[in-house]
Amino acid sequence: MSQFWGEFPEAVINTFQRLQIALIGDIKKCPLSSPLFPELSKLDAHSQHHLLASFELPRFGGVTPGVMEQLHDAESELAEARARLLRERLHAVANKENIPYLGDCMYYDAPGINQEELLQAAFLEAPTPEWESGRIRPLWPKDDWFRDAKQGPYPEDYGDIPLGDFDNLYRAFDALVEEHWMSVYSTTLNPFALLRCGSEFVEECVVSAGSLIPACMMTDHHLQPTGDRQADKEERQDYADSQDSIQSMGDFWKEFYSKDSGKKIPDSHKSRLANDPNKVGFTKSALFHKQPLAHSLAQTWANFRGTQDKADLVKVTMDMNIEKYTVRLPDAVRTTAGPLYIEWINLPRMSENSARKLAEAGWNNADICGVDLAVKSHIAVGTPVRVIISLVDGACSDMPTATMCAFEVNLAAQNNRSLNLPLLSLPFSRLLADLHDFQHRVKIACQFRDPEGFNVGTPMLSFSSLEFSELKQTAFERNSLLRDSWSEIEKRACHGGGRCVASQGIVQTWEKEVNPPLKEYAPLVLPPVPQPKRNFIDQQSGEVVRPLIQKSRSMRFKSPSDLWSRPSVDGGSTFTLSPSRGSLRCDNVPGCAYEVDPLHLLYYELVNVPKDTLGGTLLTRIDVRAKAATFDSAVWRQWVRDGCLKPKIKMRITAATSCFSGIVLGACLDAYRRIPATTKTDFTASLVTGLPNIVWATRDTSEIEWDIDLAAVCGHTFFALEDTFGYMDFLVYVLRGNEVTAVADWSIYVSFHVDWTQESMSATLIPTFVWPPEPADISYFKEVWGPYHFTLDGTEAKESFSLMPGMAIPRGAQTVRTFPRVLAAHFRSWTGKVRMSIQEVSSIFLTGTYMVGVSWNATADLTDITTRKHWIVKSGEVFELDLYCPYGENPTFTGLVNGIPYIIVHRLGGIIGPKDSVGTFGFMIHLHGLTGVYKNPTLHSGDRSVGSAWFRVTNILDDNLVFNIPGRIEDMVAVAGKYEVTNYANPTSMLFSVTGLHGGFIRLHITWCPNTSLGESKGTLKYMQYLYHTTTENFFGDQATRGIIDQNGFTVDLACGDFFGATRVGLKGEVERLGIYSSNAKSIAEIRVSFEILSMKFYGSTIRVK
């Protein structure tokens, strides 16, 4: 019995079981021995009766393949109807229990009622509202004949239906099961069923289906929840639209291929595929007629005399818009029907200058007539992966309408070529909006089918495009040169035995040879999308007016954010897109409030701030994963259900603007807990700048939204029920304290909202860094410095900062190493400019202007700076500072003799403020990266294969030496009383300490020397490689025994990483290791271990505090 039937009352199940048997034949004459039953028995009961009733198989006929294919489509419809029924029943239960509705989701805020109880209540018979009684109950029959047929009690208010009036009885059944159940049940009660089953079964169906009435009859009365959070009419309409927002690919193609093109060329939307890419292709002569010579001469003469009719002016162009574009496998979009792999690409056009010149020359329209696409596959021959490539009109949000032409290709073949006729006319104009349309309106969409097993970011295909267009000066178009039919075009596009095949027919040809059969595409999810709202300024009042725009109920599809965007061309008006799901603000409208959707809320917390708070104070450390488990929100349950996910978190912090306090707050993500839990004070920018962080001043900011993609930042997924590779620890702290004590303690509202992007079958995702370092890696250098201050009386008016990208950041008695600085430490020098800005953070009543310059020493004063290249800047202005030096290149680490480059910030104008101002004038410095590199930096060693020192073992006190080298690079710790270990620092080993995870292969170089004379030395040194190790079982790798006197030592390759492919410093788990043993260890003076990286991937950037 299908699971689908489990949600229906038993009476309905029994009814349709009997109905199904009756449809096959008389039970007495034809028991279950019919030849039809073996095939039907493979299907669920609901599909069986749907099959028999829909196709009216007479008696004992077999099930043909065509029928089976239609049956699978019917099963998909049943699954969609089941989901809709469940949502509607939940609405009914919530309405009855007065439970607030939280949006289009199966979760409700029901205090005292858990989700299991709520679902159970939804599957029970829901109450019939009073308003329904007048419409439904009069249709029920009450005749004795009907009552005797069922042999059971019935309500008295059935209404009047004459005996044997099957038409009214049929309409009553229609009213009961409503619109979306008609496709399932109406075919059951066709004339064939009535004749074969008799009236008893039909009437029994009507009575049994009565329990479905309350759940099925969902109108606006049901969809509107009770309580304080009443949905308005548009929101209820959006919900109703969303229930029909899933369109299967089969339905889409059926609608697309059956539509009338309404264009000059019939079936122009049906692209053509070439059987041989070298023998088929568009040319000007294939697409366009040639003008007669006499007509061309007449046009030339008329143009010379100035009597040329502009309606006759046509110019044919051919442009190679794309020489090569590589399409990589995108992240899947999570939908209710499965993952959707789709990549959107702008079809490049001519440059803006070229378009302007054509417009100035009088050409006003460009008709895109043909696009020739050559597709090159980048996957192995024979791999069963298909892709739908569509040319889409980006100005339309209805998928079947927006798709101008489409085709499907087999990537198992290395080369494919398609001929497409989009037939889209675009205007030439000097207006910015028209130019934007011309350059960005045409999109190419690539939807992959069954790409399982391929990693995100894998190059799947590349394509080149030729575009053929007609340029015209008017809209009359009476002299178009485009040919009139596909057949005429194909004759001239094919040569040397080439031929074209319709795109919808070629798939079945090669699909027959694929075993196992290919999976179907994921259905397109087409949610309703609000139209962009155009604001305008009232010329009399000067206020921003937001007109009401009727929402569209058409089917929508997801696409890039710039699909509908365009610059404003209306003078004096403002234009904004409708806020996206993650964006809340409408900053261009003064006093604009915003609504928060609680369905994405993972956790929130109120953080207390003391009224006399001091700089460096930690306000809170929030373990979001652990807190969310106790908070038990809807997105938490989704996380638990799906396992490993790649979350995008929006951290929303709401406080209040304080223009006088001078407080600077900050937040950071410590994904690997490198800041000790005991650290409660002394939080400075130097400590957190190497972590993902955000800084804001309360003088001008009361609320911030910090979007952070944890999968991109950390390079791995997160599991709901425990901490695996990293932590979701967010810290909130004070970087600069009060200038003026607040009136009382105050609070900050911190909330975390999650958008699950895709579940992942792999723990590690795209690495943050792949060995070896490249010259461009030094540009990763981005930091925040401060806070710094100038005194209000002018005694302190200069700050100087040394810029050594490869050095650790000093922090009192400690140092902090960051991932960008360790990367920079691999290079000896660097060149270029520093992109930076200054942010004022003190009281809003204090302002100033700064002069920023460069000095080769820290003693430069204002006079020295003004004689060199410098910048005069204000708060918030971004500029690029050229760090020129006497040697042409800047060192990345401290130069003991040559000097250090310094950035000098000098007060220039100000500081200006009220008489009673107190405190100091504070500011932060933001480094946005290194730009303008004019010479590639050089590595410390020209040969990257040279090993890096790891550690050495000395002062061995016991002859029996045993120590293990793990398959991860970390600081080695000595066994107390046995020997001493010295760890070495170098850029390569430090790289492992400032990243989250690492996985790859290293080669160990191990050498040793005796501490006695050669004649007295004796004993051996052995090693054993453990591939797998437990207390009861070992898998062994390489092994060897060497004498104490050995000049060469030995090398061993070791894998770094646990079973999931990576590991991290201090992570518990089973990794490969190398055991070192000796029974004559006192004879060894020292053992030295170096390593060489063969291949390595690093995931996530962090810091190391030492």
Curated annotation (Swiss-Prot):
Keyword field: Capsid protein, Host cell junction, Transport, Viral movement protein, Virion
Signal peptide: none
One Pfam family recorded for the sequence: Nepo_coat_N
Keyword Protein transport applies: no
Regions of compositional bias (Basic and acidic residues) in chain numbering: 224-239
Region (Disordered): 224-243
Record-linked InterPro entries: Nepo_coat, Nepo_coat_C, Nepo_coat_N, Viral_coat
GO BP terms, alphabetized: transport of virus in host, cell to cell
Molecular-function GO terms, alphabetical: structural molecule activity
Post-translational events: Specific enzymatic cleavages in vivo by the P1 encoded 3C-like protease yield mature proteins.
One Gene Ontology cellular component: viral capsid
Highest taxon above the source species: Viruses
Keyword Transport: yes
Family: Belongs to the nepoviruses RNA2 polyprotein family.
Note: Virions are comprised of 60 copies of the coat protein.
Protein name from the UniProt record: RNA2 polyprotein
Annotated organism of origin: Raspberry ringspot virus (strain cherry) (RpRSV)
Origin organism lineage: Viruses, Riboviria, Orthornavirae, Pisuviricota, Pisoniviricetes
